[in-house]
């Protein structure tokens, strides 16, 4: 079997966006592949015949992203888009090709068949020819009036406006329901009778986006609008049940700050709400397990047949649960659920494991319907528990391919981002590349990670203390448990929060022979004003701000301690990273350079905070080549 190599990301099929037909005979999904020649990703739409257990490509279009089954089980999908129109095609379930069904003079980002002769559409305006010309003429400057003023993966966000529309199938007319000028539409739902909309609106006080939203009911018949819950929650998503009540997932952020785990609530149309998930159901909603082998969108919540379905991260798994109309919670599927579609008597879902990326399964027979097994050699992942700061924490060791217990191996401590995400035992391409080249990889989920409740994940004001202790205790334990770890040839690396911790570690210990800090935070005081989340994330996480308690914020900043760095450290950053902007890495690079310590920095043009997960193929390959080159130069162990 061939080794897992850096370029293997070009061979992977990433399945996502799972939908099921009304007659429950077909599934539809996207298959995304990296395209090195065009340096992008191609997403193809597929149908899956459940009875025949076969998949069919719907279109040769490489950029399909929006699709639905209509009430007659035809596939409706956006085939193409130009300066004037978005073009939607229709295809039945035969092997024939699709045909143009309608076109809309908007940039459509959402479509839902209301089954009453209308589609519900979310869209923004296309620029007119004069507007495009003016935009080009004025491209040498930007006007900034909002906070945040940019957003990672989007860029400057000053005048991006969305609206909701009804599209009439019969005459193909478009009727605006509402636009959103001075507020953001963060979530919405329509009731069964299609006469009421529930809107989660993010208000912008003085053009500053606030953290808590308003829940608004819009009557589509009389156009009346009413705020029923004002400035109370940060919402994840919401749905109408069959009784015209609203089920929503939200956090009031009063116990654990912005990273507090949410709960499930129910409200009537007057805003009388109650919590319907138990107080001890302290789990992180959504799949926060890290991997560099997934792509596109995944479903977290769904309502069907009087049941609310939701994915949570619990321990080191992403599990699918349901909540029925009697408020009983049931575990439906364990493991790592990536996406799901609900049938009347079955659940279809994409899962990930240690040797398979997103593959299609069904719950009823626990059967793989569409396999996606990694066809290269994989190192073995072993798990163990260690104690740190009063908790028993799971640790992972990925052993090299052809592991020999009588040898010593260079070892990398890998640190995840977040901090409220986590590692698991699922496939991680980057880790396996190192394991296939003679490295041991060790990783864990220190305090601050998700999956263990709000008390465990809440490290506000403790950055660089309890989490640092966990990582060092874990490293010590791993060395004792695995004498094959060459403790004189160890490296440390991570991105985002993992980059922050890498910065912190090299400022506080010399035990690692080399380090690689990616898309990191180094200075909370400057991060506050330049990150798309800085103005609220930095005060929340540090318990300080630059004006009232500067020293507290400064003390938690790695750059404050960077004069101590002796570890050769390489930095990777993207120049369009607006989450952890480039200047954060440059500050550490500058100080370490002044220390006379070996350092270098790679800046990736046109990439953002997602470089390692969804960056353009050439950039992802080059990034991993440079990381490996750096560690090989310092750690590569040779038998003497």
Predicted regions and their residues:
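Short loop/turn segments that connect beta-strands within beta-propeller blades
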Residues: 50-52, 92-95, 168-172, 219-223, ...
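Short, solvent-exposed loop/turn segments at conserved positions within beta-propeller repeat blades
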Residues: 37-42, 81-85, 155-161, 206-213, ...
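Conserved beta-propeller blade repeats
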Residues: 12-27, 61-78, 103-118, 122, ...
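Non-catalytic accessory segments flanking enzyme active sites
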Residues: 17-19, 122, 143-144, 150-151, ...
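Cap/lid segment of the alpha/beta-hydrolase catalytic domain
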Residues: 375-488, 495, 529
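Predominantly five- to eight-bladed beta-propeller fold
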Residues: 42-43, 124-165, 213, 262-265, ...
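A short beta-strand motif characteristic of beta-propeller blades
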Residues: 4-9, 54-58, 99-102, 175-178, ...
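Active-site-proximal cap/loop segments of hydrolase catalytic domains
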Residues: 446-640
């Amino acid at each position: 079997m061939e080794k897992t190599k850096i370029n293997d990301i070009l061979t992977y099929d990433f399945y996502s966006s799972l939908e099921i037909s009304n007659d429950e005979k077909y599934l539809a999904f996207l298959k995304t592949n990296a395209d090195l020649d065009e340096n992008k990703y191609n997403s193809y739409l597929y149908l899956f015949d459940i009875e025949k257990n076969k998949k069919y490509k719907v279109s040769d279009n490489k950029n399909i992203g929006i699709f639905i089954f209509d009430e007659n089980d035809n596939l409706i999908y956006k085939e193409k888009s130009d300066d004037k129109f978005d073009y939607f095609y229709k295809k039945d379930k035969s092997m024939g090709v699709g045909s143009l069904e309608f076109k809309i003079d908007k940039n459509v980002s959402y479509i839902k068949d209301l089954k009453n002769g209308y589609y519900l559409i979310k869209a923004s305006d296309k620029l007119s020819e004069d507007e495009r010309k003016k935009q080009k003429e004025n491209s040498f400057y930007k006007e900034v009036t909002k906070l945040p003023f940019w957003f990672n993966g989007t860029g400057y966000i000053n005048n991006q406006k969305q609206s909701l529309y009804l599209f009439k199938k019969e005459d193909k007319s478009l009727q605006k329901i509402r636009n959103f000028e001075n507020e953001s539409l963060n979530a919405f739902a329509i009731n069964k009778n299609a006469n009421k909309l529930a809107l989660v609106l993010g208000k912008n006080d003085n053009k500053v986006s606030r953290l808590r939203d308003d829940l608004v009911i819009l009557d589509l018949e009389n156009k009346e609008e009413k705020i029923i819950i004002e400035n109370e929650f940060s919402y994840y998503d919401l749905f109408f049940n069959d009784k015209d009540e609203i089920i929503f997932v939200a956090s009031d952020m009063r116990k654990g700050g912005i990273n507090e785990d949410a709960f499930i609530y129910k409200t009537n149309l007057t805003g009388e709400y109650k919590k319907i998930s138990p107080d001890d159901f302290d789990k992180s909603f959504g799949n926060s397990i890290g991997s560099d082998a997934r792509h596109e969108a995944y479903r977290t919540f769904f309502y069907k047949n009087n049941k609310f379905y939701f994915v949570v991260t619990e321990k080191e798994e992403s599990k699918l649960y349901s909540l029925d109309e009697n408020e009983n919670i049931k575990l439906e599927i364990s493991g790592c659920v990536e996406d799901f579609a609900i049938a009347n008597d079955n659940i279809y879902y994409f899962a990930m494991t240690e040797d398979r990326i997103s593959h299609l399964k069904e719950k009823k027979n626990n059967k793989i319907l569409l396999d996606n097994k990694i066809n290269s050699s994989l190192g073995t992942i072993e798990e163990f528990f260690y104690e740190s700061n009063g908790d028993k924490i799971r640790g992972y060791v990925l052993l090299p391919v052809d592991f020999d217990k009588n040898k010593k191996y260079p070892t990398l401590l890998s640190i995840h981002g977040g901090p409220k995400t986590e590692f698991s035992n699922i496939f991680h391409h980057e880790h396996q590349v190192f394991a296939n080249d003679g490295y041991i990889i060790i990783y864990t989920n220190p305090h601050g990670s998700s999956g263990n409740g709000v008390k465990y994940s809440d490290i506000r004001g403790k950055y660089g203390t309890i989490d640092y202790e966990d990582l060092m205790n874990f490293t010590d334990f791993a060395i004792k448990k695995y004498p094959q770890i060459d403790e004189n040839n160890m490296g440390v690396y991570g991105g985002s929060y993992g980059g922050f911790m890498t910065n912190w570690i090299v400022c506080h210990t010399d035990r690692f022979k080399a380090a690689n800090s990616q898309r990191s935070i180094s200075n909370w005081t400057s991060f506050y004003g330049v990150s798309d989340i800085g103005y609220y994330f930095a005060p929340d996480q540090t318990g300080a701000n630059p004006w009232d308690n500067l020293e507290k914020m400064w003390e938690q900043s790695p750059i404050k301690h960077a004069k101590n760095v002796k570890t050769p450290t390489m930095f990777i950053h993207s120049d369009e990273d607006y989450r952890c902007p480039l200047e954060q890495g440059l500050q550490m690079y500058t100080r370490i350079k002044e220390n006379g310590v070996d350092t270098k920095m790679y800046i990736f043009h046109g990439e953002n905070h997602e470089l390692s997960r969804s960056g353009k193929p050439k950039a992802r390959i080059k990034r991993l080549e440079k990381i490996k080159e750096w560690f090989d130069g310092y750690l590569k162990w040779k038998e003497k």
